[in-house]
Amino acid sequence: MAKLGVIADGISQNFEYALDVMNEFELEYAELQFLWGKEVGDLNTAEVNKVQNLVNAHGVKVSCISRHIFGGLLVGEMQQDNSVYLEHLDALRRCIDMAKVLD
């Protein structure tokens, strides 16, 4: 059987409310993009810990951390000395770190 989930901010960027709705509809998996007005990868350590506590309390699993990384960059901008490229690379690292915490 297919796994049932939802992009959480499609319900609301208020993550607690989104989790309540997910529980109401028995949705087990949450894809995270925007929480509390921030894009994932921009959450601080306390906010990531709050996400972890909330998903555990609601019995939900995180299926995907989805950030708009490298979107809009031109091929010529994909260079290690390009500051915008490096910002996107840092965002990718933060998302990977968040995924490890939520695993």
Short names for language-model regions:
Residues 1-101:
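N-terminal pre-domain/capping segments
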